[in-house]
Design a protein with these regions (language model features):
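Short, acidic, metal-binding catalytic loop of nucleotide-sugar glycosyltransferases
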Residues: 21-30
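Cell-envelope/extracellular polymer assembly enzymes that use nucleotide-activated donors
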Residues: 2-4, 32, 191
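A recurrent flexible, glycine/aromatic-enriched loop bordering the glycosyltransferase active site
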Residues: 124-165
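A short, conserved alpha-helix in the catalytic core of glycosyltransferases
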Residues: 157-166, 170-175, 181-209
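Conserved donor NDP-sugar-binding/catalytic core segment of glycosyltransferases
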Residues: 69-131
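Glycine-rich, basic loop-to-helix element that forms the pyrophosphate-binding segment
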Residues: 38-52
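Catalytic core of nucleotide-sugar-dependent glycosyltransferases
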Residues: 186, 208-211, 220-242
Length: 242
């Protein structure tokens, strides 16, 4: 089973170099690597799978470092489980780098606002992996080391954007990415994963499909300051799936 790995990148050459080095060191060797520099991000992600030749397509960010058995583990899951359409895993972020992601502003804080956010937005379970909450937000548990305690395959609602693998034939059936997502295109990945799930296939998470996410403040990160686009993306996702 051939695996195509898609890296969408812009303005982060050093991060990209480290990501490619971790791909070079993979124990599984039947890899196709596609580096896509299109903009916006959703267009780059969509172009990647259309160019890919593998039965499995994976999207990783240019600022991740892959565990050496990352590819071997996810391909093994797909080969043994024909009813699985998508696979994801830990996207570990060090506590030092959590500040580089605005969605983790609540971590380590005791304010009433942080407690309210955890209760209302994260359903009171901030360390769960792969779940869409009642209001249509995503649970961030995959970013924390505590997720490594989870054994076996975990059934999930979505796949992590920087560590997402799908059967190419199902991506095609789902129509690929919705190109109407704006800016950094947040939620477009969740959207596609859920479209695949609606085709009748399982989405799973495994601790063996592990990456370290060295969250960068350059490149696409700068566009995350456009809250108008981010909110529009969230509302679009919510309207389609919640």
């Amino acid at each position: 089973m051939k695996l195509s790995v898609i890296i969408c990148t812009k303005g982060r050459p050093e991060s990209l170099k480290r990501a490619l080095q971790s791909l070079k060191q993979q124990s599984f060797k039947d890899l196709e690597i596609l580096i896509i520099k299109e903009s916006p991000l959703v267009k780059a992600r969509d172009l990647g799978w259309r160019k890919a030749k593998g039965e499995i397509v994976s999207w990783i960010d240019d600022d991740v470092i892959l565990d050496k058995d990352w590819a071997k583990s996810l391909v093994n899951i797909f080969e043994k489980n024909k009813d699985i359409g998508g696979v994801s895993g830990p996207t570990l972020v060090s506590e030092k780098l959590l500040k580089n992601r605005l969605v983790f502003w609540w971590f380590g804080k005791e304010s009433w606002w942080a407690r309210l956010w955890i209760k209302l937005v994260l359903d009171g379970k901030p360390f769960v992996v792969g779940k869409i909450t009642k209001i249509g937000w995503w649970s961030p548990g995959s970013n924390f080391k505590s997720c490594l305690k989870l054994k076996g395959l975990q059934e999930v609602d979505y796949l992590e954007a920087c560590n997402m693998s799908l059967r190419r034939e199902l991506v095609k059936k789902a129509g690929g990415f919705d190109l109407k997502y704006q800016g950094t295109s947040e939620w477009c990945e969740l959207d596609l994963a859920m479209q695949v799930k609606k085709l009748g296939y399982r989405l799973v998470w495994s601790r063996r499909v592990k990456v370290e996410h060295h969250v960068s403040r350059s490149g696409a990160f700068i566009k995350r300051r456009n809250w108008g686009e981010r909110i529009n993306n969230y509302l679009k996702f919510r309207k389609k799936h919640i």
